[in-house]
């Protein structure tokens, strides 16, 4: 059975492949059930494995020559559920054009199944500047 730390390492490697146009390794880490969801970094959401799988293929196809750095803000597991809260910083090509760094706030929710951990939800959105509540 894959430990949570091993799974997080696999996810890091899979995301590196993802930002180079290959969704396959990341998709292998997902549950393939009707209850999986993704709130994608380009907006919108998908529910159910067929829709999530399509979205992951579409998103990965937009990337190339990329690198992702992951800064973990927190993670934990209890029983058959686990989560991670990260800042993902990506550089590379999007739609064939070079871009600067993009930072995303990302939460993964995972469930233990089939002898290891599987992603059941990803929420990603752009990390914007912090607004001062006093102003």
Where are these regions (language model features)?
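A beta-strand edge to alpha-helix "cap/lid" segment located at domain peripheries
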Residues: 1-28, 35-135
